[in-house]
A protein has these predicted regions:
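Helical hinge/lid and interdomain linker segments adjacent to catalytic or ligand-binding clefts
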Residues: 115, 120-184
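Hydrophobic targeting/anchoring helices
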Residues: 1-130
Length: 184
């Protein structure tokens, strides 16, 4: 559960790092296929806060579940939104103009085209980004832009030119096993 909560924030932060600053981000707090019996209002509220802290300009969510529950029975969801709005607005105001900083977890467009699929399985096409959640859970701040110390993991190493790799090595560079294998 803890890793999932960190992943909510980090997944959105990674997406935001790829966008230009003038893009308005309307982040969806996913409530489907959940019902009020499988996802608490507190969890929905926490996810709204995590999206706000990650920098969402606005939040989108399904107020009504997919079970066609009558509106009067969904009133607690409406109350949650009403009650959390001042808190979310304050967090958004405090967050405005700020960016994540810390260990640079590098990401390159096109890396998915370089993935190896030795087993021929569909799940091998999913880029594994365990470090996005691991370091924050250990208390190590991260960002998704180049910094003085960076981590190059997995297939990302194949996305770097030799010159870029040498430049990164001139700073501080951490390689995971797969990246080291690709570099060598």
């Amino acid at each position: 559960l803890h890793q999932d909560l960190v992943a909510v924030h980090q997944g959105m932060a990674l997406s935001m790092a790829q966008l230009s600053p003038e893009v308005e981000i309307i982040s969806e707090v996913e409530n489907w296929p959940h019902t009020r019996f499988t996802k608490s209002l507190n969890m929905t509220g926490l996810q709204m806060e995590l999206h706000t802290l990650a920098g969402a300009d606005k939040i989108s969510l399904n107020v009504f579940d997919f079970m066609a529950t009558p509106y009067v029975q969904e009133k607690p969801m409406v109350e949650l939104i009403r009650d959390r709005k001042p808190e979310l607005d304050k967090a958004a105001e405090l967050r405005k103009g700020k960016a994540q900083d810390g260990l640079g977890l590098l990401w390159y467009p096109g890396q998915e085209n370089l993935l190896e699929t030795p087993g021929g399985r569909l799940d091998e096409l999913i880029i594994k980004r365990e470090f996005d959640t691991l370091f924050p859970m250990l208390g190590i701040p991260v960002c998704f832009e180049e910094r003085e110390v960076n981590l190059l993991s997995g297939v990302n190493a194949l996305c770097c030119s030799r010159e870029e790799l040498m430049r990164l090595l001139g700073k501080g560079l951490i390689l995971d096993g797969d990246a080291a294998r690709y570099v060598c």
